[in-house]
Amino acid sequence: MEDLKVTPLRGVYEEYGGKIVDFAGYELPTQFKGFLHEHHTVREKAGLFDVSHMGEVMVTGKDAGKFIQYLMTNDINILKDNEVLYTFMCNEDGGVIDDLLVYKFAENEFFLVINASNKDKDVKWIMDHKGDFDVEIVDESDSIAQLALQGPLAEEILQKIVDIDLQEIKFFKLKRDVLVNGKKCLVSRTGYTGEDGFEIYCKPEDAKGLWHAILNAGKEEGVQPIGLGARDTLRFEASLLLYGNEMDETITPLEVGMGFFVKLKVEEDFIGKDALIKQKAEGVTRKLVGFELLDKGIPRHGYEVIKDGKVIGHVTTGYKSPTLNKAIGLALVEEQYSKIGTEFNIKVRKKELKAVAIDKRFYTKKTKTK
């Protein structure tokens, strides 16, 4: 795998049986003991992920809050210090440049966590729109490693090696300078699995030690390292969207049912606001729906959705759900076919298989300490 980047944890994958693939230009483990085993481990116990390939950008300065609001669809004004917000960053047409997390450290200090596959594009977009805003933008991606501990036992495990009461960190809140196994880290109660859990940001040189410390701390509870395969099935079951599948620069947040994160009534302008106001007024012409395959087969990304011989959309993500044990998927279809109960076909390997539209919230589990 020449010319691929590596994370600070690259050296530990084989130690745990990791199978390496190219993901977003990085050598990353697709699985360790098998993605089904790993999926159930996170749902029932806890799993540890290397997510150091994600990007991190610091935005500071007198106009930091105004600048972030100009870039984002969500209402940045509601963020208090040490809180986290999920948002979209859109182009002028309302298409999604990226979906990301905004961490507010202080009034003029924000930390953006961006998707690995969009790092270069996002940083350029942010820099290109700096204009007259009095801000400093620093790409911190290469100087930060990130681990995610996810699952119902995550708090119990992590509590053993931190110097604070983790109950202090509520859902979508953060704490800086937490000592994790003696190393200073940023810890947030966030994740991409539909389970309770934490994301831990540390110095690259501390990542291996923390990886081993967390796995050792959770031995009794059955914690396991988790690869990209289970990461995708977990997020999919929880209806957490994946950039490049459910959204891209030609798809808007409104089309994928994420209008809650688009605050069109905020006083300030943001990039794409006018286009999204227009789209909301006129109504979307396509929608993201959940579906269940009624015939035997597995739907995959890109498969056509067909109604009465006409292509009405495409599958964005599809799997045989490990938790629900049935073939389900997400599809972007013409609006008139998006109602729950609507029947259509999915073209799987030249065969049209019957499917029915269902609620896309396939799996929900209340996150602790809301």
UniProtKB/Swiss-Prot annotation:
<keyword id="KW-0808">Transferase</keyword>
<dbReference type="InterPro" id="IPR022903">
    <property type="entry name" value="GCS_T_bac"/>
</dbReference>
<dbReference type="InterPro" id="IPR029043">
    <property type="entry name" value="GcvT/YgfZ_C"/>
</dbReference>
<comment type="similarity">
    <text>Belongs to the GcvT family.</text>
</comment>
<dbReference type="InterPro" id="IPR027266">
    <property type="entry name" value="TrmE/GcvT_dom1"/>
</dbReference>
<dbReference type="InterPro" id="IPR013977">
    <property type="entry name" value="GCST_C"/>
</dbReference>
<protein>
    <recommendedName>
        <fullName>Aminomethyltransferase</fullName>
        <ecNumber>2.1.2.10</ecNumber>
    </recommendedName>
</protein>
<dbReference type="InterPro" id="IPR028896">
    <property type="entry name" value="GcvT/YgfZ/DmdA"/>
</dbReference>
<dbReference type="GO" id="GO:0004047">
    <property type="term" value="F:aminomethyltransferase activity"/>
</dbReference>
<dbReference type="InterPro" id="IPR006222">
    <property type="entry name" value="GCV_T_N"/>
</dbReference>
<dbReference type="Pfam" id="PF08669">
    <property type="entry name" value="GCV_T_C"/>
</dbReference>
<dbReference type="Pfam" id="PF01571">
    <property type="entry name" value="GCV_T"/>
</dbReference>
<comment type="subunit">
    <text>The glycine cleavage system is composed of four proteins: P, T, L and H.</text>
</comment>
<dbReference type="InterPro" id="IPR006223">
    <property type="entry name" value="GCS_T"/>
</dbReference>
<dbReference type="GO" id="GO:0019464">
    <property type="term" value="P:glycine decarboxylation via glycine cleavage system"/>
</dbReference>
<comment type="function">
    <text>The glycine cleavage system catalyzes the degradation of glycine.</text>
</comment>
<dbReference type="GO" id="GO:0005960">
    <property type="term" value="C:glycine cleavage complex"/>
</dbReference>
<dbReference type="GO" id="GO:0005829">
    <property type="term" value="C:cytosol"/>
</dbReference>
<keyword id="KW-0032">Aminotransferase</keyword>
<dbReference type="GO" id="GO:0008483">
    <property type="term" value="F:transaminase activity"/>
</dbReference>
